[in-house]
């Protein structure tokens, strides 16, 4: 199974959205892109580890392509915000694509160039995945387990709804 690794704000949001994508087999939230080995949530939140909150997506490429995952990624977060998404501020919330091979790198850079040609000042970082550290168990599939938690209601749920609206519009065309 191929994998994709993206970061774009709180990993609960990306996790909840990508779990709704046809062809996605599993999503694991975690940390990547930094220096400290075996980081935990509290350390990552301080910003000193250099890690971003990310999702590792296990997908069936016969159902959904890496390009389609990139499209979804760029539609559900703001790639023009440096080190933040909305009220979540810090390097751990940066927009980042961690590629697993040269093909993913080329596709990510091509997509960013397309967005820049549309006038977006994309600040998404693109770098090779060195190591992915799964987050603590309580973070996994957080939205499904805590839909009435205020952050989930006011931040995560709207992103899921945005994706579902896009998905339904694409089915109509």
Swiss-Prot record:
Pfam family, one: PMSR
Keyword tRNA processing set for record: no
Assigned EC number: 1.8.4.11
Catalytic site positions: 10
SUPFAM superfamilies documented for this protein: Peptide methionine sulfoxide reductase
InterPro entries, A to Z: Met_Sox_Rdtase_MsrA_dom, Met_Sox_Rdtase_MsrA_sf
Top-level class of the enzyme under EC nomenclature: oxidoreductase
Domain of life: Bacteria
GO biological process terms, semicolon-separated: protein modification process
MF term (GO), any: L-methionine:thioredoxin-disulfide S-oxidoreductase activity
Keywords linked to the UniProt accession: Oxidoreductase
Catalytic activity: L-methionyl-[protein] + [thioredoxin]-disulfide + H2O = L-methionyl-(S)-S-oxide-[protein] + [thioredoxin]-dithiol; [thioredoxin]-disulfide + L-methionine + H2O = L-methionine (S)-S-oxide + [thioredoxin]-dithiol
Record's keyword annotation contains Mitochondrion: no
Family from the record: Belongs to the MsrA Met sulfoxide reductase family.
Annotated function: Has an important function as a repair enzyme for proteins that have been inactivated by oxidation. Catalyzes the reversible oxidation-reduction of methionine sulfoxide in proteins to methionine.
Name of the protein described by the UniProt record: Peptide methionine sulfoxide reductase MsrA
Organism: Nautilia profundicola (strain ATCC BAA-1463 / DSM 18972 / AmH)
Gene this protein is translated from: msrA
């Amino acid at each position: 199974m191929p994998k994709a690794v993206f970061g774009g704000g709180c990993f609960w949001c990306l996790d909840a959205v990508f779990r709704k994508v046809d062809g996605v087999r599993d999503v694991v939230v975690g940390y990547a892109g930094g220096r400290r080995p075996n980081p935990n949530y509290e350390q990552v939140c301080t910003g000193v580890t250099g890690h971003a909150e990310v999702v590792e997506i296990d997908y069936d490429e016969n159902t959904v392509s890496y390009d389609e995952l990139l499209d979804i990624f760029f539609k559900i977060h703001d790639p023009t915000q440096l080190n933040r998404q909305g009220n979540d501020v810090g390097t751990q919330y940066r927009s980042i694509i961690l590629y697993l091979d040269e093909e993913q790198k080329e596709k990510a850079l091509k997509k960013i160039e397309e967005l820049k040609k549309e006038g977006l000042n994309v600040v998404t970082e693109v770098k090779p995945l060195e190591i992915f550290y799964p987050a603590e168990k309580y973070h996994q599939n957080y939205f499904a387990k805590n839909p009435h938690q205020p952050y989930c209601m006011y931040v995560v749920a709207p992103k899921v709804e945005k994706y579902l609206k896009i998905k339904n519009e694409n089915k109509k065309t």
